[in-house]
């Protein structure tokens, strides 16, 4: 498969999964929050999902397999904290350290998660949060 076809396939796969999560939960709220600069959380997580699937395809070519469904959902939900962390609200202090736990709590409110998806979400800030991932999809 050419890289162009693969990139288009991945983009469609990410868009489909994002639509499913938006219908079943609150993923569309992430369009309202800025992640970094002028990039929304939604744009950030869909970009991470595309990059993750692209990397997974390359790994697959050399015999390294991943749980693609968990990788995709985990990537889309890794920043599912659902608040504007730029707001000076005291509960947003130490956002970099705490948001994986908030993201996991919000995702568990809206979705049934696999243990691997939980690990992807809560461990994605390693080494800032010093507990390493326990599955390859979370790296």
Task: Name the predicted role of every residue range.
Residues 1-139:
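Metal-dependent phosphohydrolase cores
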